[in-house]
Design a protein with these regions (language model features):
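Conserved catalytic-core motifs of GNAT/GCN5-like acyltransferases
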Residues: 126-128, 138, 143-158
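Short acidic/glycine-enriched loop/turn segments that link adjacent beta-strands
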Residues: 50-52, 85-86, 151-155
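Conserved GNAT acetyl-CoA-binding A-motif
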Residues: 116-130
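Conserved acetyl-CoA-binding loop-helix of GNAT-fold acetyltransferases
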Residues: 95, 101-114
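Short amphipathic alpha-helix that is part of the acyltransferase structural core
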Residues: 2-51, 55, 59-73
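Short strand-connecting beta-turns/loops that link adjacent beta-strands
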Residues: 49, 63, 83-86, 164
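Conserved beta-strand in the GNAT
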Residues: 57, 66-82, 86-94
């Protein structure tokens, strides 16, 4: 099922995000990575502070958002980094549990890939995907480039999207 049209796509450097929205983004990551997935490594690694890091999220309007004075509540989030070798890295992909299987993850990944192509058209895009999502990322054109490894107590696999490849597919939502 595609994400509703009322969803808003946002992107900004950390310094440009209002405190309430930043809190809601941190809470979403905490809920998914720490509470739900029981990740063993800290989420806050300092890379969000890099001015070149772009935080991206989808938000939905509603009464709760209005009561907090923000345009919408974040339902999906990720960050886009630039590696030392010029490659783009997408990470910290999180979708609120109540909004999974609604197309939000795929929509946000599509936006992130478009952003990567605009900002670094010749760069490859890298992800360290949770192993159970390997096929989901493969459906967007990512190729597995390494074996399983543990990160934060969760099985991951290194994947890459080569320049000029990949397009969001209509199959498989998260």
């Amino acid at each position: 099922m595609p994400a509703p049209t009322a969803v808003a796509v946002r992107r900004a450097a950390l310094a440009d995000i209002d405190p309430c929205t930043l809190y809601l983004l941190a809470k979403l990551r905490q809920d998914v990575f720490t509470l739900e997935q029981r990740a063993t490594d800290p989420d806050l690694d300092g890379r969000d502070l890099d001015p070149a890091t772009t935080l991206m999220w989808l938000e939905l309007p509603g009464a709760e958002a209005a009561s907090l004075g923000v345009p919408g509540l974040p339902v999906a989030h990720l960050r886009v980094l630039v590696e030392d070798d010029g490659a783009v890295r997408i990470g910290r992909v999180a979708v609120d549990g109540a909004h999974r299987r609604g197309g939000y993850g795929r929509r946000l990944m599509g936006e992130a890939l478009a952003h990567a192509r605009e900002s670094a058209p010749r760069a490859e895009v890298r992800i360290d995907a949770q192993a159970h999502l390997e096929q989901w990322y493969a459906s967007m054109g990512f190729e597995t480039v390494g074996g399983l490894f543990m990160e934060a107590g969760i099985e991951h696999v290194a994947m890459v999207l080569r320049p000029g490849h990949g397009a969001p597919s209509a199959h498989g939502t998260i």
